[in-house]
Swiss-Prot record:
It is found in: Plastid, Etioplast membrane; Plastid, Chloroplast outer membrane. Keywords: Chloroplast, Ion transport, Membrane, Plastid, Plastid outer membrane, Porin, Transmembrane, Transmembrane beta strand, Transport. Residues 12-16, 43-55, 81-101, 127-130, 167-169, 190-212 are chloroplast intermembrane. High-conductance voltage-dependent solute channel with a slight selectivity for cations transporting triosephosphates, dicarboxylic acids, ATP, inorganic phosphate (Pi), sugars, and positively or negatively charged amino acids. Homooligomers form large rather nonselective pores in plastidial outer membranes. One of its GO terms (biological process) is regulation of monoatomic ion transmembrane transport. This is Outer envelope pore protein 24, chloroplastic. Belongs to the plastid outer envelope porin OEP24 (TC 1.B.28.1) family. It comes from Oryza sativa subsp. indica (Rice).
Length: 224
């Protein structure tokens, strides 16, 4: 059994989350229970609890007992002309009765991997007027630098992301959303002791009077 504890600090607000994952030795299914601090803030409750059943690379089922939200995800991949093609179908809905319940949402995601350095991805939400097309290019022999331009046809806008990995588990990522003029910088570190750390800052370039938004996260993994 594996346990994960995550802490997140955003301005003057701190949140925490914990996950327990159990994989039967005779099966490739994985059972997972995740809870945020909302599950314990006012005594034990179902709020903030998510139950997951998944078979990696095949399907995933998420259930939030408090809101009765359900998410189904099915994925598959195959070789087509020596190119890896991957497809993911995601359907989100709620079992809660009432006229105010949010509408169901269905999304399709596909990717075509040309080689280890080049991949084309496409995502579309059924009922929407557009899609997102992303190209990923990993530069160099070790592919430590990744460049990812993305075009949103619905908003007619570009997003750009550049990630640089370093020896030792460090990585720096910069993203820019042209539609919102939002610039984000992330630094992450993966530790050999089963922990990871992340510090992020985002800047609203459309209103330079706003202070940057700072976020710090830490994740710890344990074997039980």
């Amino acid at each position: 059994m594996k346990a994960t504890v995550k802490g997140r600090y955003e301005g003057d607000k701190a949140t925490a989350a914990a996950t327990l994952a159990f994989t039967p030795s005779a099966a490739d299914l994985r059972f997972k229970a995740s809870a945020t601090d909302a599950a314990f803030a006012r005594g034990p409750s179902l709020e903030g609890l998510t139950l997951t059943l998944e078979k990696p690379g095949s399907f995933l089922l998420d259930l939030k007992p408090h809101s009765k939200d359900v998410r189904f995800q099915f994925m598959n991949s195959a070789l087509l002309l020596d190119r890896r093609v991957s497809l993911t179908y995601t359907h989100s809905t709620t079992l809660s009765p009432g006229p105010a319940k949010p509408p169901a949402r269905t999304a399709l995601d596909g990717s075509l991997t040309f080689d280890p350095a080049n991949k084309l991805s496409l995502s579309h939400t059924l009922g929407s007027s557009g899609c997102r097309v992303k190209y990923s290019y990993a530069h160099g022999q070790d592919r430590l630098t990744t460049i990812e331009p993305c075009f949103d046809t619905a908003n007619n806008a570009w997003d750009f992301a550049v990630t640089r990995k370093f020896q030792g588990g460090d990585a720096i990522k910069a993203t820019y959303q042209a539609s919102t003029k939002l610039l984000a910088l992330d630094w992450t570190r993966d530790s050999k002791i089963g922990a990871s750390f992340k510090v992020a800052a985002s800047f609203d370039l459309s209103d330079q009077s706003k202070a940057p938004k700072l976020i710090a996260e830490s994740t710890w993994n344990y074997e039980i």
